[in-house]
């Protein structure tokens, strides 16, 4: 009789992750905080605890004592497909890791499980499966011409050919949310900061591939990271500035892992850079905004990397800004709903989560809901529009530009 093959494997799960799967006590604390579980009407399969329990059951059926004695129990394909849907119905925001009393690094676990399933031909979710081929071919997720990477640059913005600082624009700011690129570049010019950009040599950071379990597919993610690092080195830069939280997280956390070495330059978010300049009294404001502003922590910037205070410091020092906090902030903030591929794969779920976050902002009576991530901004705008709410959604760097008397158009 032919030996049965287990329906799943554990090849890309680390020893620590295998122990983490066993360490879940099923206390349910994560269930209370999960944004997609709440937004879905409490669909059981989306609860972090449930996903861990099911994968543990799959492992027991495949590799437990009974499986070793009598062979693995086959897991129906339909069941694995349903599990795939639930694993991808997660923004990988990391709130479950924050509240987990067993200390499980759930973000890493969810991404590993996604990768595991994709390697078995199960997933990714919906149109996410096109990411490796298209990003590998076009070097950006929008399928636009790389030669247009700097098409947004207005005549008044000065860019050096080489400099110690590279502004890594990101695909979204460079192609879609141009106000973010206008604001960042003009603020740097206004402050006398010499910087350069990579232009058509700037490739996608790879975040979309990594977050959706496709980090391994054709080695595209590694190729992107390697190319970008070499392009930055060629500019002679020692520091790279990011206004996109997703690019920042990918560069700071994922690139070193993919390449197996530390980066030869410093990775800095624009709010960290501005905080330092404000503390050194190097910013001379020109305009009072006279607005009440609240701030949404992007998961990639906050929980994933730990940058919580710089955006708040910057906002609180802008003339005329009354800064107010929402109920859930910093480590315990509510995700905007766009991360982990959910915006692309399950847009209705992403919108529902965004509506909840916009309601948090409305409770503060703020004029402006700010963030430091173009993906958060886009989804929060969608949530606001869906609610027909009267609140401005804007990036922190755009508010800085306005207070310096600069145009973002």
UniProtKB/Swiss-Prot annotation:
Binds 2 [4Fe-4S] clusters per subunit. Residues 14-44, 81-110 form the 4Fe-4S ferredoxin-type domain. Keywords: 4Fe-4S, Iron, Iron-sulfur, Metal-binding, Methanogenesis, Oxidoreductase, Repeat. The keyword Chloroplast does not apply. The gene is hdrD. InterPro entries: 4Fe4S_Fe-S-bd, 4Fe4S_Fe_S_CS, Cys_rich_dom, HdrB/HdrD_reductase, Helical_ferredxn. GO terms for biological process: methanogenesis. The dihydromethanophenazine:CoB--CoM heterodisulfide reductase is composed of two subunits; HdrD and HdrE. Pfam families: CCG, Fer4_8. Part of a complex that catalyzes the reversible reduction of CoM-S-S-CoB to the thiol-coenzymes H-S-CoM (coenzyme M) and H-S-CoB (coenzyme B). [4Fe-4S] cluster 1 binds at residues 24, 27, 30, 100. This is Dihydromethanophenazine:CoB--CoM heterodisulfide reductase subunit D. GO terms for molecular function: 4 iron, 4 sulfur cluster binding; CoB--CoM heterodisulfide reductase activity; metal ion binding. The lineage of its organism: Archaea, Methanobacteriati, Methanobacteriota, Stenosarchaea group, Methanomicrobia. Its cofactor is [4Fe-4S] cluster. Its EC number is 1.8.98.1. Belongs to the HdrD family. It comes from Methanosarcina acetivorans (strain ATCC 35395 / DSM 2834 / JCM 12185 / C2A). It catalyses: methanophenazine + coenzyme B + coenzyme M = dihydromethanophenazine + coenzyme M-coenzyme B heterodisulfide. Pathway: Cofactor metabolism; coenzyme M-coenzyme B heterodisulfide reduction; coenzyme B and coenzyme M from coenzyme M-coenzyme B heterodisulfide: step 1/1. [4Fe-4S] cluster 2 binds at residues 34, 90, 93, 96.
């Amino acid at each position: 009789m032919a030996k049965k093959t287990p329906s799943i494997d554990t090849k890309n799960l680390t020893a620590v992750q295998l122990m983490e799967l066993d360490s879940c006590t099923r206390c349910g604390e994560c269930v209370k905080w999960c944004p997609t579980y709440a937004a879905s009407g409490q669909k059981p399969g989306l609860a972090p605890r449930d996903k861990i329990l099911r994968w543990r059951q799959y492992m027991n059926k495949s590799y437990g004592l009974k499986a070793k004695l009598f062979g693995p129990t086959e897991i129906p394909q339909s069941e694995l497909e349903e599990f795939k849907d639930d694993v991808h119905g997660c923004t990988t925001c990391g709130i479950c890791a924050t509240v987990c009393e067993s200390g499980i690094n759930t973000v890493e676990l969810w991404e590993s499980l996604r990768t595991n399933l994709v390697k078995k031909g199960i997933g990714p979710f919906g149109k996410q499966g096109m990411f490796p081929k298209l990003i590998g071919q076009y070097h950006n997720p929008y399928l636009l011409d790389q030669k247009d990477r700097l098409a947004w640059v207005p005549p008044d913005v000065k860019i050096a050919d080489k400099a110690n600082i590279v502004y890594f624009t990101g695909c979204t700011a460079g192609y879609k949310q141009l106000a973010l690129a206008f604001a960042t570049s003009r603020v740097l010019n206004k402050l006398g900061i010499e910087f350069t950009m990579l232009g058509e040599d700037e490739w996608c950071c790879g975040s979309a591939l990594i977050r959706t379990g496709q980090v391994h597919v054709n080695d595209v993610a590694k190729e992107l990271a390697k190319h970008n690092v070499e392009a930055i080195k060629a500019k002679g830069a020692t520091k790279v500035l990011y206004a996109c939280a997703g690019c920042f997280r990918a560069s700071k956390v994922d690139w070193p892992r993919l390449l197996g070495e530390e980066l030869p330059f410093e990775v800095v978010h624009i709010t960290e850079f501005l905080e330092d300049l404000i503390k050194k009294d190097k910013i001379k404001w020109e305009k009072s905004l006279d607005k009440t502003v609240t701030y949404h922590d992007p998961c990639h910037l906050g929980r994933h990397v730990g940058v919580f205070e710089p955006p708040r410091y910057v906002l609180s020092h802008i003339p005329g800004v009354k800064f107010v906090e929402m109920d859930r902030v910093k480590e315990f903030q509510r995700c905007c709903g766009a991360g982990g591929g959910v915006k692309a794969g399950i847009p209705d779920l992403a919108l529902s989560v965004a509506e909840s976050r916009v309601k948090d902002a409305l409770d503060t009576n703020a004029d402006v809901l700010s963030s430091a991530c173009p993906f958060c901004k886009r989804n929060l705008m969608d949530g606001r529009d869906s609610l027909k709410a009267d609140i401005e959604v804007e990036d922190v760097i755009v508010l800085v530009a306005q207070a310096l008397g600069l145009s973002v158009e």
